[in-house]
Amino acid sequence: MATDQLGTGLPWVDAIAASFPQHSFDAFHAHELPALNAQHGTLITEDLAGVPALAFQLADGATYTWRATPTGVEAVNGDVGATTLVELDETTFSAFLNRLLSASGAVRTDRARLRRGTLDSWRRWEPAIQTLLTGMPIYTDAVRGVLVDREGRPLDLHQAFTADDDRDAMRHFFNVAGYLHIRGVYSSTEVASWGTEIEKVRAMTTPGDPFSWWSLNSTGAEIVTRINYLGRYSDALQELCTEPRMTEYARLAGPELRVCDDRLDGPMVFIKNSDVVKGDGDLGWHVDDGIGGHPVMCPLIQAGIQLDNANAANGQLMVLAGSHRYTKHPIQWGQEGELPLVKLDTEPGDLTLHFGDIMHSTPPPTAPNAGRRVLYYKFAEEKTFEWIPAGCHYNDALFRADAAGKVSSRAATH
């Protein structure tokens, strides 16, 4: 799979990190962590009950072990009893606390090393750590109690709106549930025209294109599953960045949001294929800031113009309702339990919107000849444009050398 490789070459992680608090490793554990635990510890006691201890260690040997307690968490010197031992530097530790790097992002970019334990055992602690820092609760099936309309009644999580519906009702649903489905926004003529443009772009995209994702099917054939920066090949698809209906609905999440027409992969298309056996043609449960960058990119809105039927057979978007307002554990397909899983069935001309940090997924189509196409346009706040230059993505920063020379190959955005 190939994806964006261009960028400014600047050490973005260092520049962005300097805009956030720098945490002294010793002072954080001695003073800040106890204070945070006094504020928010009760939010994590149930989640951490019985979870093995986690330790962080600097290169000079300074080490603190985090242990679950009946009142939250405590940190003690040394690594005795720690099932997981993470080695990192003070800059990376700060970036992790500031959510500029996730546990996954820190390991994948070689900014942290697991001396003991696994990435999963570090990630097991991650929602609780984020909750300590922010006061945001951890996502569980208890969310169903707050997925309510303006009168306090349970939301119909499968509700589809129309262009004639009340904007305040739509805004409330969007902000509470984290997604929105609006039927019939675009005409069949518009959909057909954009579909023709997509096929033109697809014909011009070849394996090795740094702005596209490629997968393999069971015959070994390479198939394109995502094409970024569509304006390279299509003026019409680039001009859609300023399409007023999409802009109006995206701004239900915030009037200051701007379309990312020239960064964060720009206008893009997802193409679902059947029989994908390797690559990112099918995406498990993820968030768009999964390797880091939450305060830089979020709130991030993904606006999807549906060009084909979306359902289990042809491929569809799934979301975990309300999860954008919580810290959350990684999960796999089949582990959703009683969480409010919503499968969005859509038709050509529909518009879907979702927050980038809602848990979402696009599972394999069940039909043998799937071909769903959906155009995506991102919307973000001004801060995102100030930090991320044109032609670049936050992930590019993570996968380029920083001041210490740490670098890794660019990976997918989830």
PLM-predicted stretches and their roles:
Residues 107, 113-114, 181, 353, ...:
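Hydrophobic beta-strand signal
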Residues 346-360:
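Conserved metal-binding segment of the jelly-roll/cupin
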Residues 2-165:
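Feature captures hydrophobic
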Residues 327, 358-414:
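Non-heme Fe(II)/2-oxoglutarate
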Residues 151-176, 183-283, 400, 407-408:
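Non-heme Fe(II)-dependent double-stranded beta-helix
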Residues 248-255, 278-345, 385-393:
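Catalytic core of non-heme Fe(II) oxygenases with the double-stranded beta-helix
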